[in-house]
C-alpha cells in the first residue's frame, strides 16, 4: 500500500505530535455538495449509490477535491449490516430508512446470522480497496459502522423512531432477547470493521447515534458493553501502523469517563459538551474528536471562523484533537462555509 503523505489524523488520534489540528467532517460527502447531488441522481437510489464501489469511491473523494481535509471517510450507510442480514432496507421520502422485515420477537432475532463481509457486503470492501487506490496515500481512509444498540433500534423499530417504544419495551420486558440481538450485532460489527481494515481502512469509527436515549445504567449494559466487546476484537495493527478506533455516542456527554475505559483511542463529542472540559475529564487516556455545532455553518463565514477558533482554543495546546462537527453536516450548508472552516482550523491549530 502507498506511503501516507498526510498522517496528521492518525497521529492526532494516537495523541502523537502534529503540525496542526487535523479536520474532517461527518457526512463530508453529502447533499450540501452539488457534485454529490449530481452523482446521486445518476445512481438512481441511495442504496444503488452505496452498492456501487465506483460511485461510492467517486463521492468519497469529492470533498477532498474541494477542501484540504485530513481524511476521507468511506461513503456508505450504517444500516448495511442489517440489510445484509435480510431485513430489506429501503429509503422512503420524508421518513428515512425503513426495513421491510423488522425483527420484533425472539424467533426472528434467533434466526439472524453474522453476514460475511466478503460476500454479502463485498460492495463495501471493494469500495474500500478502490478508494485506497485512488487516494494514493494523500490522506488516510476512515471506515465505520453503527453501534450494536443503534443498529438494534432500527431493526426492532423498523426504521427511525422518536419514542423507541418497541426496543425499550424489549429492553425492560425481555432483556435476554435484546442481549442476544446485541451479541450477534457486536460480532457482526467486529467482523465487518476488521474486513474494512483488511481492505485498507486506516482508522475506524463506531457511530452510536441513539445511545443518548438510554438511562446511565441502560447505556452501560445495552450500548457501552457491546462497543467495548467490539474494541477488544478489532485488528489494531495493519500495514505496519496502529489502526485507531473512535467511539461516538450522540448525547453521551455524561458518560465520557466510562467510554474512555473501553480501550478505544478516541472519543467523538457532540456539541453539547465543552471540549476543554471533556479533555479535563478524560485526561490523557484518549484523543477527542469534535465538536462544532453543525448549525454554526448557517452563519456568516466570519462567525464560522470565530466558532472554529473557539473549539481549537477550548481544547488547548498539545496533540490529541481531531476537529469535526458535533454531528453530520446539514444538507443546506454553503460549501464556501466549509472552506472557511477548514482553513481556520488549520490556521488556529498550528503547533
From Swiss-Prot:
SUPFAM superfamilies referenced in this protein's UniProt entry, alphabetically: UROD/MetE-like
Instruction: Read off the InterPro entries from this record.
Output: UROD/MetE-like_sf, Uroporphyrinogen_deCO2ase_HemE, Uroporphyrinogen_deCOase
Matching entries from Pfam families are given as: URO-D (PF01208)
Please name the GO terms of the biological process aspect recorded for this protein, alphabetically: protoporphyrinogen IX biosynthetic process from glutamate
Could you tell me which pathway this protein works in? Porphyrin-containing compound metabolism; protoporphyrin-IX biosynthesis; coproporphyrinogen-III from 5-aminolevulinate: step 4/4
Q: How is this protein annotated for GO cellular component?
A: cytosol
UniProt subunit comment = Homodimer.
Known PANTHER family for this protein?
A: METHYLTETRAHYDROFOLATE:HOMOCYSTEINE METHYLTRANSFERASE RELATED, UROPORPHYRINOGEN DECARBOXYLASE
Family, according to the entry, reads as follows: Belongs to the uroporphyrinogen decarboxylase family.
Instruction: Please identify the protein, giving its name as recorded.
Output: Uroporphyrinogen decarboxylase
* Organism for this UniProt entry: Thioalkalivibrio sulfidiphilus (strain HL-EbGR7)
Q: What gene name does this entry carry?
A: hemE
Amino acid at each position: 500500500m502507498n506511503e501516507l503523505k498526510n498522517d496528521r489524523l492518525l497521529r492526532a488520534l494516537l495523541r502523537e505530535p502534529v503540525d496542526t489540528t487535523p479536520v474532517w467532517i461527518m457526512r463530508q460527502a453529502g447533499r450540501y455538495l452539488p457534485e454529490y447531488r449530481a452523482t446521486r441522481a445518476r445512481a438512481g437510489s441511495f442504496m444503488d449509490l452505496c452498492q456501487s464501489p465506483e460511485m461510492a469511491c467517486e463521492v468519497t473523494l469529492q470533498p477532498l477535491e474541494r477542501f484540504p481535509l485530513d481524511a476521507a471517510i468511506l461513503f456508505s450507510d450504517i444500516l448495511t449490516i442489517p440489510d445484509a442480514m435480510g431485513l430489506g432496507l429501503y429509503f422512503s421520502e420524508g421518513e428515512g430508512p425503513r426495513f421491510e422485515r423488522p425483527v420484533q420477537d425472539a424467533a426472528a432475532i434467533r434466526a439472524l446470522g453474522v453476514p460475511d463481509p466478503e460476500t454479502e457486503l463485498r460492495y463495501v470492501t471493494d469500495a474500500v480497496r478502490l478508494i485506497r487506490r485512488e487516494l494514493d496515500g494523500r490522506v488516510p481512509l476512515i471506515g465505520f459502522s453503527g453501534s450494536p444498540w443503534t443498529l438494534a433500534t432500527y431493526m426492532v423499530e423498523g426504521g427511525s423512531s422518536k419514542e423507541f417504544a418497541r426496543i425499550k419495551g424489549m429492553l425492560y420486558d425481555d432483556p435476554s432477547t435484546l442481549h442476544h440481538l446485541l451479541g450477534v450485532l457486536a460480532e457482526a460489527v467486529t467482523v465487518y470493521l476488521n474486513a474494512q481494515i483488511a481492505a485498507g481502512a486506516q482508522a475506524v469509527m463506531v457511530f452510536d447515534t441513539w445511545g443518548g436515549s438510554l438511562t446511565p445504567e441502560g447505556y452501560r449494559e445495552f450500548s457501552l458493553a457491546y462497543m467495548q466487546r467490539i474494541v477488544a476484537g478489532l485488528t489494531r495493527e495493519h500495514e505496519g501502523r496502529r489502526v485507531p478506533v473512535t467511539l461516538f455516542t450522540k448525547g453521551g456527554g455524561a458518560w465520557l469517563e466510562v467510554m474512555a475505559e473501553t480501550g478505544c483511542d478516541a472519543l467523538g463529542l457532540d456539541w453539547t459538551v465543552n471540549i476543554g472540559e471533556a479533555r479535563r475529564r478524560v485526561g490523557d487516556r484518549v484523543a477527542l474528536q469534535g465538536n462544532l455545532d453543525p448549525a454554526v455553518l448557517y452563519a456568516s463565514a466570519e462567525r464560522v471562523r470565530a466558532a472554529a477558533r473557539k473549539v481549537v482554543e477550548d481544547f488547548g495546546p498539545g496533540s490529541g484533537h481531531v476537529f469535526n462537527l458535533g454531528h453530520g453536516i446539514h444538507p443546506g450548508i454553503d460549501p464556501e462555509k466549509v472552506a472557511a472552516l477548514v482553513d481556520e482550523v488549520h490556521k488556529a491549530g498550528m503547533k
